[in-house]
A protein has these predicted regions:
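EF-hand and EF-hand-like Ca2+-sensor regions
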Residues: 6
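Phosphate-binding and adjacent anionic-ligand microenvironments
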Residues: 1, 9, 15, 33-172
């Protein structure tokens, strides 16, 4: 298995964590355990891993989409992409690896349980430390591909100043 998803019990049901949430949890856990080198994630993934790496004094690379690019990061300590592909032990497997990811996630969950907390509590701790960044995939289909270029040009020319009533603080 090359992928690993995680879900948490919430209000009598289960909520699947996003790839970005799981990536933040894994990156933070590995950094707290003394990881050295560089973290990496694809450009379509959250910027949160970069903040986590900076907080712990680690390097961070943003790569093109696809694990072949993440795996090329020099001194890779941890890499992920939002499509639930994680590389928590690049010295053992320098690719996305669901098996080693499940072992690391189980260890993190056990740590949370021992502290009478949860994975969601740990995420809140991460957000309190480095800032919250939430992502949500958006898919739309068009028949005329030039519409995508037009839409991106329009957003670049006049970036939004607010989203869902909240001010936009920075546009990259």
């Amino acid at each position: 298995a090359d992928r690993c998803a995680a879900a948490v019990p919430t209000d009598g049901t289960w909520r699947q964590l996003s790839g970005d949430e799981t990536g933040a949890l894994l990156g933070d856990y590995l950094a707290r355990r003394g990881a050295t080198g560089n973290f990496a994630n694809s450009l379509v993934s959250s910027r949160l891993l970069g903040r986590i790496a900076a907080h712990y004094g680690l390097g961070h690379e943003e790569t093109l989409t696809g694990f072949k690019w993440i795996a090329r990061t020099p001194e890779l300590a941890f890499g992920y992409e939002e499509a639930i592909g994680f590389c928590p032990d690049p010295n053992a497997v320098r690719d996305k690896d669901g098996i080693s990811t499940s072992v690391v996630l189980a260890s993190l969950a056990a740590e949370c349980e021992a502290a009478k907390s949860s994975l969601l509590d740990r995420l809140d701790d991460i957000y309190a430390t480095v800032g919250a960044l939430h992502t949500q995939p958006l898919t739309f289909r068009v028949e005329d591909l030039s519409l995508i270029t037009q839409a991106m040009d329009k957003v670049s020319a006049t970036p939004p100043t607010e989203l869902a009533g909240s001010p936009v603080s920075k546009v990259e």
